[in-house]
A protein has these predicted regions:
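Short, flexible helix-loop junctions that flank or precede catalytic/ligand sites
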Residues: 1-214
Length: 214
C-alpha cells in the first residue's frame, strides 16, 4: 500500500495511526517493523519496532545505500508488516516490491498529486512493469490532503449564500448532494479568531487496483 500527498499532508501521521491500528487489531502478536529517516513520531505498540536510518550525511550515495540496505536487512527479520518512511529511488522501490512478493504487508509513501500518479511515479523510477502492474503486489493507492474545517460556531448554510458563490460551483454542489446539509465559510467569530475555520481534516482518494485497472 502506497500513501501519497504533498508535503505537510499528514502522511506520516496516517502511517503511525495505521501501524498502531494493526498492532491493536492483532493484540500485539504480529511483528511490525518500521524504517524511517528520521522517525517523526513515536509509534506505540507491543509488536512495533521503529528503526532509524544511520548513514554518513556527507556522502551523497550513503543515503540511497542506507535505504536499500535497511529495507533488505528488515526483510531478513521476517516482519509481518513493514513500514518504509518513503520510497525515494529505484533501489528502495525494488526492495519494497520484493518484500511484497515474499508476503510482507508493506506500507510506504511517495510525493504525488493523485492516487493514480503513484503508478506513474513508480514507473518513472524504473520499476519493472511486471512488478508494477501486478495487483497482488500493489494492493492500495492512497492520496490524501489536509483541508480546513469550517468553524462550527459561525459557518453559514449554503442555501442562504449561494448567490454569492460561483455559478459552476453551485450547480456542481446541487448535482452531487443534498444542499440542505451543506455549509460554507462564515464571517469569522471569537471561537475561530475571525478566520471562519477551525482545525483540519483528511480528504483521501483511495484506489484498490484490480487486474482490469492495472
Amino acid at each position: 500500500n502506497i500513501l501519497s500527498g504533498p508535503t505537510g499532508s499528514g502522511k506520516s501521521m496516517t502511517l503511525k495511526v495505521t501501524m498502531e491500528g494493526l498492532d491493536k487489531l492483532h493484540g500485539g502478536s504480529k511483528h511490525i517493523l518500521t524504517i524511517e529517516d528520521p522517525p517523526e513520531y513515536r509509534i506505540r505498540g507491543e509488536g512495533i519496532n521503529q528503526t532509524p536510518l544511520v548513514y554518513d550525511a556527507t556522502d551523497p550515495d550513503a543515503e540511497r545505500q542506507a535505504w536499500a540496505a535497511g529495507i533488505a536487512n528488515g526483510m531478513r527479520l521476517d516482519p509481518d508488516y513493514m513500514m518504509i518512511g518513503e520510497v525515494r529511488d529505484l533501489f528502495a522501490a525494488v526492495a519494497a516490491f520484493r518484500g511484497a512478493m515474499t508476503g510482507h504487508g508493506l506500507w510506504s509513501t511517495l510525493h504525488t498529486n493523485s492516487a493514480i500518479g503513484i503508478v506513474q511515479r513508480l514507473k518513472d523510477l524504473g520499476v519493472d512493469p511486471g512488478l508494477l502492474f501486478d495487483p497482488a503486489l500493489l494492493t492500495g493507492l492512497i492520496n490524501q490532503s489536509l483541508l480546513p474545517k469550517l468553524c462550527p460556531h459561525c459557518k453559514v448554510r449554503f442555501q442562504d449564500h449561494q448567490d454569492q458563490l460561483a455559478l459552476d460551483l453551485v450547480e456542481r454542489v446541487q448535482r452531487l448532494t443534498d444542499v440542505s446539509q451543506v455549509y460554507v465559510k462564515g464571517p469569522g467569530c471569537q471561537a475561530c479568531r475571525g478566520s471562519g475555520v477551525n482545525g483540519r481534516s483528511i480528504v483521501a482518494e483511495v484506489v484498490l487496483p484490480t487486474l482490469a485497472f492495472m
